[in-house]
Amino acid sequence: MLLITEILIINFFAATDLVQLYIVYEASLIPMVIMIGVWGSRTEKKIAAFQILIYTLIGSIFMLMSIGLLYSTLGTTDYILIREYIEVLPENVRKIIFIGFFIGFAVKIPIAPLHLWLLRAHVEAPTAGSVLLAGILLKLGGYGYIRYNIGLFPDLCEYYFPIIGGICLISILYTGIATLTQLDVKRIVAYSSISHMNVIVLGLFSGVLQGLEGGIILMIGHGIVSGGLFLCIGVIYDRCKTRILYAYNNLVHMMPIMAILFFLLVLGNIAFPITSNFVGELLIFIGLIKKNIIIAFFSALSMIITAIYSFWLYNRIFFVNEIITREANEGIQMEVNKMTIKEGGINKKVTEGEIIGELEYPQYIKKESMKYSDVNIFEFVSIGLMVILMLIVGMKPSLVEGYIAINCLELISK
């Protein structure tokens, strides 16, 4: 499945014909749907796979409409020819095509309210699926914006930026605040991923060189950091057999190496200096300040919210003491006991380890109940490579910036 996905993604990035683009864009769904539907880790994996299919197919209808409109007016689906003659189209036609591409790729980013499929997909997906989804598949939307919205319609990006900026700000603030209410650690990272991807969209559509460069660098950094966080959560779940936040207790004593790796990735998630996300977000905010100071101010709030829930997540997993954890568990039990299951007309009280929908009452994690005490060599290398890449890009951003600067200048000059 991973090999098939890789082939489809390479074809998407290399596509020079819009029909080829549409085919591989749709086909890239199939491996992920199978991966979640067959190897998913929870009871609602088939629903998650179905949601991915429906959301993406509905979004791609708008993209197909834009491709059809381009073909009917220009007589070709070749990207090079379309880019050369796109200016001859009437303004209203160009706006319709722009909106169609924007909605089609907005599902893949995703931008609220088109984000619901991603939350369920991450919760139900196996660890490899979550890493692939956060690290690569979401970037198809960002690349689509760069090549087909910004590359073909730079003037309309300027025209629609206030609307796009407002939508992204709502999405950023909503997902950031919603993260603080979650109990499932995978949902927390999934919400964080949505927030970061919307910051990327702001940078890409800012029309400023620094914003565009920052958006591309943050896409790289987000893929590294979010992928690493999902790997860490997968390792912790393998030991503790639960992802409910309040189930964990002082894991720093049981998994000290994991605590260090997780902390470094949390620093990357909050865009701490010398990490890849810092470079990307700094450039984006410089671009937004040049573009619109109000949007820049409210988008900067995302950094504060991200720091709050990231350190809160880390503290709850690795440093919460036994008294706090037991009190929290008692609070959860009181809330869960209000929910009942009717079996044969009889209300059934919820007990430890039982699942109500997506909420599983967690048993208190103790060292003797864990299969291993810390990461093994394979897990250490996998997560460690993510950390090293994050630090390399953060300390030496010119390694990637040099490759994207020329193309960004070309886009901005239009």
Curated annotation (Swiss-Prot):
Localization annotation: Mitochondrion membrane
Q: What are its E.C. numbers?
A: 7.1.1.2
Work out whether the entry's keyword set contains Translocase: yes
Q: Which GO terms describe its cellular component?
A: mitochondrial membrane
**Record field: transmembrane:** 18-38, 47-67, 96-116, 126-146, 160-180, 188-208, 216-236, 254-274, 293-313, 375-395
Its biological purpose: Core subunit of the mitochondrial membrane respiratory chain NADH dehydrogenase (Complex I) that is believed to belong to the minimal assembly required for catalysis. Complex I functions in the transfer of electrons from NADH to the respiratory chain. The immediate electron acceptor for the enzyme is believed to be ubiquinone.
Homology family: Belongs to the complex I subunit 4 family.
What is the protein's name according to its record? Answer: NADH-ubiquinone oxidoreductase chain 4
Q: Which organism is it from?
A: Dictyostelium citrinum (Slime mold)
